[in-house]
């Protein structure tokens, strides 16, 4: 298994765990972002950390986005005693629409599969213009354009990883 295949496998398996932990039947872009942030010592994790986005910060940003989205329709999570999400099933979650789009953007950002690097996965996630991830980053005060530039710089300077 090539290094990129191993990285993709690890990220997708971790994203599946995140999706199940949140009670989601599908792996979405936010689960991929959490999985990338959890991969200590990798180029994408270092780029996120350089922007103040370690795993816990990404998780907090996604929680804020959830609360903000609920408040947009006049609902407060604090007003209800909600149970923890249940694990949907033993079957691994499928990759959902935003997860597929993020991976498609990642693959499209490299000229050939042999040129694909872990940072391309992060690039594919961050290139979304709408959705949970860009809303969460905006609420966290992250300059998405700057973060995208950092990822592109990491790709340009990364001949091996």
Protein language model features and the residues they cover:
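Histone-fold recognition with a strong bias for associated Lys/Arg-rich disordered tails
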Residues: 1-161
């Amino acid at each position: 298994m090539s290094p990129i295949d191993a990285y993709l496998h690890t990220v997708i398996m971790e994203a599946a765990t995140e999706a199940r932990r949140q009670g989601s039947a599908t792996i979405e872009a936010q689960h991929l972002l959490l999985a990338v942030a959890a991969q200590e010592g990798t180029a994408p994790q270092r780029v996120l950390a350089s922007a103040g986005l370690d795993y816990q910060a990404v998780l907090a940003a996604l929680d804020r986005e959830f609360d903000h989205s609920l408040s947009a329709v006049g609902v407060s999570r604090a007003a209800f005693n909600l149970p923890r999400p249940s694990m949907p099933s033993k079957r691994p979650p499928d990759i959902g629409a935003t997860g597929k789009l993020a991976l498609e953007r990642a693959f499209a950002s490299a000229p050939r599969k042999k040129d694909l690097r872990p940072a391309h996965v992060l690039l594919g996630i961050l290139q979304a213009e709408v959705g949970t991830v860009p809303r969460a980053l905006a609420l966290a005060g992250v300059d998405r354009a700057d973060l995208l530039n950092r990822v592109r710089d990491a790709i340009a300077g990364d001949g091996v990883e």
